[in-house]
From Swiss-Prot:
Alphabetized InterPro entries for the sequence: 3-IsopropMal_deHydase_ssu, Aconitase/3IPM_dehydase_swvl, AconitaseA/IPMdHydase_ssu_swvl, IPMI_Swivel, LeuD
GO molecular function (one): 3-isopropylmalate dehydratase activity
Enzyme class: lyase
Protein name in UniProt: 3-isopropylmalate dehydratase small subunit
Gene name of the record: leuD
Keyword flag Cytoplasm: no
Highest taxon in the source lineage: Bacteria
Length: 201
C-alpha cells in the first residue's frame, strides 16, 4: 500500500523548460541503486550544480532559489519525462519531495511510471499552463491546491479542470500499487484456490 492521494496543497516551483528528459531528471551515473530512496539529492543534478561532485549549487536554477525551497508541486512545459524509460525519474522527484507535476503533456512511459510511484501527473492545456506560469512569476512562493477527487487545480481565485483515467484515479486515491490491487480480491483468490482439485494446489 502507498500513501493515499486525495488533495494536496503545496509550494509551486516553475521549471520553464520543454522536453525535460529523464537523463536531466536523474543522470545515468546515479542509477546504481535499486531502492526508491536516495535519488532526491541527485534530482536535476546537471542543472542544480556547477560541478560534477554536487558541491557548488547553481544559484540561477529554480530549485536553488530560496523562495522555492520545500516545493512539492512542479510546473513544467510539454513532453515532460521524455527519453529513456527509467523509473528512477519519478523516484528522484518523489524522494526530493514532489507530489505533483503539472504540464501540457508527458512522455507515455514516464506518465505511467509516475502513477506507479504515487506522483500525480496533471495534464492541462497550453493556455492554462501559460496562465499558471504567469501567476507563479507574479506571486512568488505561491501555493496551488490539487484536488484529485474533484479533478481540479486551484490557483489564486481560479480553478482548472483536468482529466484522468478513472482506474488510475481510483488507485491514487486509495494508495493502491499492483500488490494492493491484488489484495483487494484476496477473498475471491482464496475461494478460487480452494475450489481447485487437490493436485493443482
Amino acid at each position: 500500500m502507498m500513501e493515499k492521494f486525495i488533495q494536496h496543497t503545496g509550494l509551486v516551483a516553475p521549471l520553464d523548460a520543454a522536453n525535460v528528459d529523464t537523463d536531466a531528471i536523474i543522470p545515468k551515473q546515479f542509477l546504481q541503486k535499486v531502492t526508491r530512496t536516495g535519488f532526491g539529492q541527485h534530482l536535476f543534478h546537471d542543472w542544480r550544480f556547477l560541478d560534477d561532485a554536487g558541491q557548488k549549487p547553481n544559484p540561477e536554477f529554480v530549485l536553488n532559489q530560496p523562495c522555492y525551497q520545500g516545493a512539492s508541486i512542479l510546473l513544467a512545459r510539454e513532453n515532460f519525462g521524455c527519453g529513456s524509460s527509467r523509473e528512477h525519474a519519478p523516484w528522484a522527484l518523489t524522494d526530493y519531495g514532489f507530489k505533483v507535476v503539472i504540464a501540457p503533456s508527458f512522455a507515455d512511459i514516464f506518465y505511467g511510471n509516475a502513477f506507479n510511484n504515487q506522483l500525480l501527473p496533471v495534464k492541462l492545456n497550453d493556455t492554462d499552463v501559460n496562465e499558471l506560469f504567469e501567476w507563479v512569476q507574479q506571486n512568488k512562493a505561491c501555493r496551488f491546491t490539487v484536488d484529485l477527487e474533484q479533478q481540479k487545480v486551484h490557483a489564486g481565485n481560479k480553478s482548472y479542470d483536468f482529466e484522468i483515467d478513472s482506474f488510475r484515479r481510483h488507485c491514487m486515491m486509495n494508495g493502491l500499487d499492483s500488490i494492493g490491487l491484488t489484495l483487494q480480491h484476496l477473498d475471491a483468490i482464496i475461494t478460487y484456490e480452494q475450489e481447485q482439485p487437490v493436485f493443482l494446489r
